[in-house]
């Protein structure tokens, strides 16, 4: 990956450590951390972004679209935990023969997620899925606070019927009165 003028490849490497979990080394092709939970709701493709139409809707993304490393725990009692760290938020989605440049005023980012399928040995709960995730990006400028993102929700599948509820939020860390804090 270092043969392209000291630029990184837009690659992902998955390492399965058997009973110890999984490790994913990712150069920003998204899907890691809370980015995996940005929209877990049941869909009939009614969302505009489901048809590749731009909406301006701010979904949580966390460390996912940045160069990152994610550890996924083995599933125990229906629960899976992931921890994702991005050493420099803003260095992301890099194509071959390209580079992302400086990450700006942001430092490292980290995500923690928990996904639970609490079947408890019953057939009726086999379709229940609970999820929660949080992200924090460290700002390196003294006039800005850290950025925080969070998401949580549940889905329930029973036969062909799928129901869900989720909520997410973003605190940008911006100090100026005219800046939007989602």
Regions found by a protein language model. Give the residues of each.
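Outer-membrane beta-barrel proteins
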Residues: 1-182
């Amino acid at each position: 990956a270092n043969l392209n003028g000291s630029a990184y490849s837009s690659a992902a490497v998955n390492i399965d450590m058997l009973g110890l979990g999984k490790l994913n080394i990712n150069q920003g092709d998204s899907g890691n951390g809370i980015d995996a939970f940005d929209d877990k709701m049941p869909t009939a493709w009614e969302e505009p972004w489901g048809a590749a139409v731009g909406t301006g809707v701010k979904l949580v993304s966390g460390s996912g679209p940045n160069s990152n490393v994610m550890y996924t725990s083995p599933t125990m009692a229906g629960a899976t935990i992931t921890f994702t760290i991005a050493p420099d938020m803003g260095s992301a989605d890099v194509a071959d023969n390209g580079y992302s440049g400086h990450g700006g005023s942001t430092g490292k980012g980290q995500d923690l997620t928990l996904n639970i399928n609490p079947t408890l040995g019953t057939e009726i709960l086999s379709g229940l899925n609970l999820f929660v995730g949080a992200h924090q990006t460290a700002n390196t400028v003294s006039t800005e606070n850290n950025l925080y993102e969070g998401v949580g929700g549940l889905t329930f599948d029973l036969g062909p019927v799928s129901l869900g509820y989720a909520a997410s939020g973003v605190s940008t860390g911006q100090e100026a009165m005219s800046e939007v804090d989602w």
